[in-house]
Amino acid sequence: MAANAPIEKIRNIGISAHIDSGKTTLSERILFYTGRIHEIHEVRGKDGVGAIMDNMDLEREKGITIQSAATFAMWGEYNINLIDTPGHVDFTIEVERSLRVLDGAILVLCSVAGVQSQSITVDRQMKRYRVPRIAFVNKMDRSGANYDRVAAQLKEKLNHHPVQMQMPIGAEDRLKGLINLIEMKAYYFDGESGEDIREEEIPAELLEEAKTRRQQMIEGVAEVDDQLGELFLADQPISNEALIAAVRRATIGLKMTPVMCGSAYKNKGVQLLLNAVCAFLPNPKEATNEALDQKNNEAKVILDSDPEKPFVGLAFKLEDGRYGQLTYMRIYQGRVTKGDFIINQSNQKKVKVPRIVRMHSSQMNDINEATAGDIVALFGIECASGDTFTDGVVNYTMTSMHVPDAVISLAVAPKDRSNLTNFSKALNRFTKEDPTFRVHRDEESGQTIIRGMGELHLEIYIERMKREYNCEVQAGKPQVAYRETISQKGEFAYTHKKQTGGSGQFARVCGYIEPLPSDAVQQYEFVDDIVGGSIPREFIPACDKGFTEAVKKGSLIGFPVVGVRVVINDGAFHAVDSSEMAFKTAAIMGFREGYAAAKPIILEPMMKVEVQAPEDFQGSVVGQLNQRRGTILSTETAEGYVTAVAEVPLNTMFGYSTDLRSATQGKGEYTMEFSRYTPVPRNESEALMAAYKEKLAAEQAARK
């Protein structure tokens, strides 16, 4: 284990991909070649061990990566912090969190399936955080592998400027090695696990094609790099050093994506990919990181990866380890030493750093100090995910991470009442770890409701309660997060009057509600059009409070009302009897009056569903989606597989994975992510309203 490398030699990289693109296998090979592990394990724990990066039992069993493990590795003189991120859409917050702390990333694509829906989602997240990336076309040994087609899809589907840096020698099961188009050398991977690299001249029969491809590569880089472009246009000779420097500049500037290829499973191309990570991806000094200065009205500040500047670190992930809470932290500026006192900017609490470790999945190595650019884990620090720590000299917070809304909820309770303490502990820990996992108690029913990003997301947490807290859980039927809105303008003029001896209550509010434009960012807007003081200024905020309260629960089925603008333009008050309370009540009742007149409708979440199955099953795949009120957006067939993309109501998607498995003999796969809200068909709407009325009547009867 080397000491801290100079910052120029540090790379903080993530591996992001569509589920089953071979991402965890690639991470495992990287750890093997960098000497962090001494044998290779396969992903699904068939050999009783499972991949090192998948360190929760559940992950090894399901063969999907859930928590992004942070691992430290060394390649030559470079220190590489590797973050393995989940590829399943239900775990998007983990991907977002790790991208927040990375300087660069490897986008893994399957050579057969190419750019899939989850690749698009992950890429969108990378764009949001301006993460430079290298594309790695994996599984080149598979039947139907097509390096050129995947590179073309990067341009068509993701709007990248892809430049192929390599050329495969052979394809599918005849994949022998790779040609590096910069060095113009052929590389072969010998030894039991591809650890012995043999460099040779390019085979004569491939030389012409390699020369053509090298020229295309130079043209591709010259298009986006001015310095290389000038040499190219002037017909000057271009050295390998000039070419590497140009690729690096263009990649870090997000102007191009170098495209590499290989097969992690067959141990081909991983070492060349590591060389490319060091050559083309930025060091922490070259990445731009912003913070908000709390002393200066949240003005943006650019952080400097200088170990001598005041300390700023971001807690981006929490885990409960054997020795207490483990806090993963990215150091953006300054340094932190064992025994230091640091300040949590979210609550101004001062905490001591008892222990700093470098993580290797769930194993750890103690270190005394971490400096700018490092990713480490601290013990004994109480905080929430996303908290910023400083040494107190500066009052900076890192920009808050984008947290998507939950789309599905579930009522849960422990099967055994004596397990209530563990049940509460588990929920408390999970909400701290994962901002997209939300818990609330339904006041009316007294039930505990958990909300998340999809069925699998919630299932995993229920399973974790059982495993980690010995708490079996009863779960209700999943509930869809419906919304209500209005379809036209509705007026209101409501007077709230109460006289019960002593001072009474009086308030009158008049105005209208109308739909907001469909592209509006906020879901509720309050407009004060009062002139002439018909409602005194001090009562206007109370009106806003009342309307805000009213939109929390619509009258059709009791779900939040979205997409409304409330305008008040008249009213009346009483010198003695008017109060904030009276105006708040009048606003609530006024909203209900206007809402009833504005033709309210129910909205349901629509999901973008992408299904992949052998093309023999195309009819049944499309048929199933149609049965579930789905709208087919596209179908593509390639290499014997059909990919169908559809928009389907979430309400009809429960149990879909079982149906798809049986319809495709277990060969079909699907991913699903939230797309938008749309009006519910009339018959569905009537059924939902009838069920809501019944529920209210039952609750009323129970209270009597």
Swiss-Prot record:
<dbReference type="InterPro" id="IPR031157">
    <property type="entry name" value="G_TR_CS"/>
</dbReference>
<dbReference type="Pfam" id="PF00009">
    <property type="entry name" value="GTP_EFTU"/>
</dbReference>
<dbReference type="Pfam" id="PF03144">
    <property type="entry name" value="GTP_EFTU_D2"/>
</dbReference>
<dbReference type="InterPro" id="IPR009022">
    <property type="entry name" value="EFG_III"/>
</dbReference>
<protein>
    <recommendedName>
        <fullName>Elongation factor G 1</fullName>
    </recommendedName>
</protein>
<dbReference type="InterPro" id="IPR027417">
    <property type="entry name" value="P-loop_NTPase"/>
</dbReference>
<dbReference type="InterPro" id="IPR005517">
    <property type="entry name" value="Transl_elong_EFG/EF2_IV"/>
</dbReference>
<dbReference type="GO" id="GO:0005737">
    <property type="term" value="C:cytoplasm"/>
</dbReference>
<dbReference type="InterPro" id="IPR020568">
    <property type="entry name" value="Ribosomal_Su5_D2-typ_SF"/>
</dbReference>
<dbReference type="Pfam" id="PF14492">
    <property type="entry name" value="EFG_III"/>
</dbReference>
<comment type="function">
    <text>Catalyzes the GTP-dependent ribosomal translocation step during translation elongation. During this step, the ribosome changes from the pre-translocational (PRE) to the post-translocational (POST) state as the newly formed A-site-bound peptidyl-tRNA and P-site-bound deacylated tRNA move to the P and E sites, respectively. Catalyzes the coordinated movement of the two tRNA molecules, the mRNA and conformational changes in the ribosome.</text>
</comment>
<dbReference type="InterPro" id="IPR047872">
    <property type="entry name" value="EFG_IV"/>
</dbReference>
<feature type="binding site">
    <location>
        <begin position="84"/>
        <end position="88"/>
    </location>
    <ligand>
        <name>GTP</name>
    </ligand>
</feature>
<feature type="binding site">
    <location>
        <begin position="138"/>
        <end position="141"/>
    </location>
    <ligand>
        <name>GTP</name>
    </ligand>
</feature>
<dbReference type="InterPro" id="IPR041095">
    <property type="entry name" value="EFG_II"/>
</dbReference>
<dbReference type="InterPro" id="IPR005225">
    <property type="entry name" value="Small_GTP-bd"/>
</dbReference>
<dbReference type="InterPro" id="IPR004540">
    <property type="entry name" value="Transl_elong_EFG/EF2"/>
</dbReference>
<keyword id="KW-0251">Elongation factor</keyword>
<feature type="domain" description="tr-type G">
    <location>
        <begin position="8"/>
        <end position="285"/>
    </location>
</feature>
<dbReference type="GO" id="GO:0003746">
    <property type="term" value="F:translation elongation factor activity"/>
</dbReference>
<dbReference type="GO" id="GO:0005525">
    <property type="term" value="F:GTP binding"/>
</dbReference>
<comment type="similarity">
    <text>Belongs to the TRAFAC class translation factor GTPase superfamily. Classic translation factor GTPase family. EF-G/EF-2 subfamily.</text>
</comment>
<dbReference type="Pfam" id="PF03764">
    <property type="entry name" value="EFG_IV"/>
</dbReference>
<dbReference type="Pfam" id="PF00679">
    <property type="entry name" value="EFG_C"/>
</dbReference>
<dbReference type="InterPro" id="IPR004161">
    <property type="entry name" value="EFTu-like_2"/>
</dbReference>
<dbReference type="InterPro" id="IPR000795">
    <property type="entry name" value="T_Tr_GTP-bd_dom"/>
</dbReference>
<dbReference type="InterPro" id="IPR035647">
    <property type="entry name" value="EFG_III/V"/>
</dbReference>
<keyword id="KW-0547">Nucleotide-binding</keyword>
<keyword id="KW-0963">Cytoplasm</keyword>
<keyword id="KW-0648">Protein biosynthesis</keyword>
<dbReference type="InterPro" id="IPR009000">
    <property type="entry name" value="Transl_B-barrel_sf"/>
</dbReference>
<dbReference type="InterPro" id="IPR014721">
    <property type="entry name" value="Ribsml_uS5_D2-typ_fold_subgr"/>
</dbReference>
<dbReference type="InterPro" id="IPR000640">
    <property type="entry name" value="EFG_V-like"/>
</dbReference>
<dbReference type="GO" id="GO:0003924">
    <property type="term" value="F:GTPase activity"/>
</dbReference>
<feature type="binding site">
    <location>
        <begin position="17"/>
        <end position="24"/>
    </location>
    <ligand>
        <name>GTP</name>
    </ligand>
</feature>
<keyword id="KW-0342">GTP-binding</keyword>
<dbReference type="InterPro" id="IPR035649">
    <property type="entry name" value="EFG_V"/>
</dbReference>
